[in-house]
């Protein structure tokens, strides 16, 4: 059984027990979070497709960690002008573990 859900501006395909990195959710480590924007659930019996979301479906996940991604280096450069600008960025993300995928018919 797998599901596709949307959080932030991205979509993720998950199965129960999977650990994934998503955009930052402002909750503490150890809390559970529920996702209601489910686009698709594929169980062994049948396939449920939302339009755009499945109304009676939900995904429950546990927050494992809040951390920062690797640093991205940004360099701006203009030739022959002796202009160089260096900047870095570290994106925040949340690591979650999918506890259960539920759907009521």
UniProtKB/Swiss-Prot annotation:
Keywords: Ribonucleoprotein, Ribosomal protein, RNA-binding, rRNA-binding. Pfam families: Ribosomal_L21p (PF00829). SUPFAM superfamilies: L21p-like. GO terms for biological process: translation. One of its GO terms (cellular component) is ribosome. InterPro entries: bL21-like, bL21-like_sf, Ribosomal_bL21, Ribosomal_bL21_CS. One of its GO terms (molecular function) is rRNA binding. Disulfide bonds: none annotated. This protein binds to 23S rRNA in the presence of protein L20. Part of the 50S ribosomal subunit. Contacts protein L20. Belongs to the bacterial ribosomal protein bL21 family. This is Large ribosomal subunit protein bL21. It comes from Blochmanniella pennsylvanica (strain BPEN).
């Amino acid at each position: 059984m797998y599901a596709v859900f949307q959080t932030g501006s991205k979509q993720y395909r998950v199965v129960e027990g999977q650990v994934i990195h998503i955009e930052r959710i402002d909750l503490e480590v150890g809390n559970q979070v529920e996702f209601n924007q489910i686009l698709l659930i594929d169980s062994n019996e049948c396939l449920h497709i939302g339009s755009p979301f499945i109304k009676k479906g939900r995904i429950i996940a546990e927050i494992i960690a809040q951390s920062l991604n690797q640093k991205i280096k940004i360099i701006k450069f203009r030739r022959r002008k002796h202009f160089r600008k260096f900047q870095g960025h570290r994106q925040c993300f949340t690591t979650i573990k999918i506890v259960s995928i539920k759907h009521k018919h």
